[in-house]
A protein has these predicted regions:
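Conserved P-loop NTPase "ATPase switch" module shared by AAA+ and STAND
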Residues: 32-50
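Short glycine-rich substrate-engagement loop in P-loop NTPases that contacts/grips substrate
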Residues: 2-35
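Conserved catalytic/switch belt of AAA+ P-loop NTPases
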Residues: 45, 51-67, 81
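Short helix-coil junctions and helix-kink-helix linkers
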Residues: 183-192
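Interdomain motor-coupling "hinge/lid" segment immediately C-terminal to the ATP-binding subdomain
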Residues: 70-72, 77-175, 179, 212
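Catalytic P-loop NTPase motifs of RecA-like helicase/translocase cores
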Residues: 8-10, 44-48, 74-75
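A cross-kingdom feature that marks ATP-driven nucleic-acid transaction machinery
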Residues: 197-204, 209-367
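Structural recognition of the conserved hydrophobic beta-strand(s) that form the central parallel beta-sheet
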Residues: 40, 64-70, 91
Length: 367
């Protein structure tokens, strides 16, 4: 409990309990006047009937309440529904790369390699040595995410749920949907699982903030395409731990890092689709779709972004900017590469920047 202008008041462990009446009596004894108080509650799920207790403070004009928790009860969008219109949800992401570099003892090049391998969960970042980091990630996955997801959602086929996680981990940034995943189970795992069950598991992963989905958006038609979607991990360290650090594929890992950074900055992020019709050498018209990796929106601001791990030659550059040249509007278009290049605009007004500048300077895409 924190009173403006005074020191933090520690609630002693022996006075903490799950009895809501005792808890509320203790708080009342500490709120001594009409000053502004802040109630900071960690692991709120340990308190019985905590929803009712928290709602009881709604009419207290001199009290703001902040709650956190790591249990299945809180790793859920149901909490936002429970307090809809009566509170604000703050989504706490792992450390951004800029935050990571504040504690990393090395240069940004080695830093990004480690960040893409072990992620930005503070508990893991502060561990020393590869083995300790890997062990911490494995423990988080098994003891927090898997346990809480299966417990809260009453998952019986835990093996299928873990198989689905492995499939998603091996194909980050790939377009997929429950029907495609069902076929993968049938051909690769030799097992039968319904698309409805797969959708339920995907929703469980998203509700626990383990993954996020990016929906496809028809840029010309200005309409969303329901399926398929792309899935990105909220922390790459968790993704890599899931597959025992066997597949460290930098192209899609960089794409995942860019996606997470954009979400941390507050953008909504979609996958852009541009339907086109072209004639082949025989004069036959063929229809195809070009893709823009990210369509980023925040209010009236929009950016189109391509993630290109490397631009070794002009052919590759033309390939990356081709979708941009089919977009009729004037919103800014950006290519992000891992190549060490100075920020520059080409003859089409397309900005190219390197991944380090993008991650370390939140204003670089505005310049």
């Amino acid at each position: 409990l924190y009173l403006i202008g005074e020191s933090l008041i520690q609630i002693q462990k022996e006075k903490r309990g799950i009895d809501p009446e005792k808890f509320m009596a203790y708080i009342r004894s500490k709120v001594a006047d009409d000053g502004m108080y802040y109630l900071l509650l960690d692991e709120i799920q340990m308190l019985d009937c905590f929803e009712a207790v928290l709602n009881g403070y709604l009419r207290k004009d001199n009290m703001d309440v902040f709650v956190t928790g790591s249990n299945a009860k809180l790793l859920s969008k149901d909490i936002a529904t429970e307090f809809a219109g009566r509170g604000d949800e703050i989504h706490m992401y792992p450390l951004s790369f800029a935050e990571f570099m504040n504690v990393y003892n090395g240069d940004k090049y080695m830093g990004l390699s480690e960040y893409m391998l072990y992620g930005g969960i503070p508990l893991v970042v502060l561990r020393e040595g590869a083995n300790d980091k890997a062990a911490a990630l494995q423990n988080l996955f098994n003891e927090i995410y898997i346990r809480d997801i299966t417990k809260r959602n009453h998952v019986k086929n835990i093996g299928a749920l873990e198989d689905l996680l492995n499939i998603l981990s091996s194909a980050i940034g790939s377009l997929t949907n429950p029907e495609k995943l069902k076929n993968t189970f049938k051909t690769v795992k030799k097992s039968r699982i319904t698309s409805a069950t797969i959708k339920k598991y995907l929703d469980c992963f998203e509700d626990s903030f383990l993954i996020e989905s990016a929906q496809r958006y028809d840029i010309k038609g200005k309409a969303y395409i329901e399926t398929p979607k792309k899935y990105y991990f909220s922390d790459l360290g968790l993704r890599n731990a899931r597959i025992n650090f066997r597949q460290f594929e930098q192209t899609h890992s960089m794409e995942n890092v860019i996606y997470n950074e954009l979400r941390m900055r507050g953008y909504s992020v979609d996958v852009g689709v541009i339907p086109i019709a072209e004639k082949d050498k025989a004069g036959k018209v063929t229809r195809k779709q070009l893709e823009v990796d990210f369509v980023c929106n925040m209010g009236s601001v929009r950016y189109y972004i391509q993630s290109a791990y490397s631009l070794p030659d002009e052919t590759k550059r033309i390939q990356e900017i081709r979708p941009f040249r089919r977009i009729d509007d004037s919103f800014k278009k950006i290519v992000i590469t891992k190549d060490i290049v100075q920020p520059h605009y080409d003859e089409y007004g397309i900005l190219t920047i390197n991944i380090y500048d993008f991650l370390l300077d939140p204003h670089c895409i505005e310049k």
